[in-house]
């Protein structure tokens, strides 16, 4: 017969593990979807548009005795603007700071373009690396095996996983491996914490996601959302004021929409999701302002968690 004290002693004897796992890949490979799947909650915005993740977002998951801190880095691509350069630099910096690197490849696209460039760049990164092939349910197994072999010829990956971030297939195997692979040590964060992103910033990211989803190709990436006011009210609700910054008057008209239709839809969708996360009523007020060349303002980069490139 085992007593409660004996069970507690046995549990205490199992060493805890913790570490940082950088998830890198080309834009739209499914990194944010996978992070949200592995963490079990929304910590990173998802849209069909590329380059939606701008800074490193940490999602925190507990699996067995391990605390796994995922770093959802911006997609790596050929930079053209100052903001692009900052995002790519941040992604590679996150990879080099991690205990382990997970390269996510879209199996449908294979190794070409940005994915090939990333593989070459990983040759100079000395952290342990694993390969994760995403969207495997859309590709023949024979082609998946060829893709895995080709990637492993370029970089010596410790393991190769085949998953679907959308359905969760194969994700449990990834978590089992990471929980055993990370170094022994105390947990970095409280057990109930799922992200180190401040709520004000997460709320702004949610609004930015709804902006992308609503406007599709109409609004360029020259937009930025800031939470300017956060008021906890006596009735238990929260009043949030956010500003959507764009670079030109023509972009402001697109964000507002005819008769304010677009901004109302964006506000409704964002308010609903923020309220669900906070588990309290939310009053969200959105304003659209023109700030010319905000993409060249060092202060805006700091607010996004990015270093300002020279």
From Swiss-Prot:
Residues 134-137 are annotated as: G4. Residues 215-292 form the KH type-2 domain. The keyword Oxidoreductase does not apply. Residues 72-75 are annotated as: G3. CDD domains: Era, KH-II_Era. Residues 25-32 are annotated as: G1. Its main location: cytoplasm. It is a peripheral membrane protein. Gene3D superfamilies: 3.30.300.20, P-loop containing nucleotide triphosphate hydrolases (3.40.50.300). Residues 17-184 form the Era-type G domain. One of its GO terms (biological process) is ribosomal small subunit assembly. It is found in: Cytoplasm; Cell inner membrane. An essential GTPase that binds both GDP and GTP, with rapid nucleotide exchange. Plays a role in 16S rRNA processing and 30S ribosomal subunit biogenesis and possibly also in cell cycle regulation and energy metabolism. Monomer. NCBIfam families: era (TIGR00436), PRK00089.1 (NF000908), small_GTP (TIGR00231). Belongs to the TRAFAC class TrmE-Era-EngA-EngB-Septin-like GTPase superfamily. Era GTPase family. This is GTPase Era. It comes from Sinorhizobium medicae (strain WSM419). The lineage of its organism: Bacteria, Pseudomonadati, Pseudomonadota, Alphaproteobacteria, Hyphomicrobiales. The gene is era.
